[in-house]
Amino acid sequence: MRTFKEIALEIREKWENVSPHAKPYLDAMACIDSSDKNAKYHYDSAAFIVAYFLSNAIGFKGDDAIRIKAELKSMIQ
């Protein structure tokens, strides 16, 4: 299983114009070198950060986006 950091790096490669609303959560994900949904970034869990990223990433579209979003959803369930 990939870490949240690895996934965030791929998102940055695939999503050219990251939404300013999703960017803070993407930046936080890039600091979580774990695949544990309970891993912490400051006071927030990875699950919290990913959930907020997903809710703000509606502009991230296409086959890669669908695959990555599904991967993230499965990691926080």
Predicted regions located by residue number:
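Residue-level signal for secondary-structure boundary elements
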Residues: 16-23, 37-40, 61, 65
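Short, compact, well-ordered microdomains
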Residues: 56-77
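N-terminal acidic leader/helix
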Residues: 2-28
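Terminal low-complexity, poorly structured segments
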Residues: 22-25, 50, 56, 68
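Acidic, low-complexity, intrinsically disordered interaction modules
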Residues: 33-61
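Generic L/I/V-rich hydrophobic alpha-helical segments across diverse proteins
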Residues: 8, 26-29, 47, 65, ...
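Low-complexity, intrinsically disordered/propeptide-like segments
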Residues: 7, 29-32, 57, 75
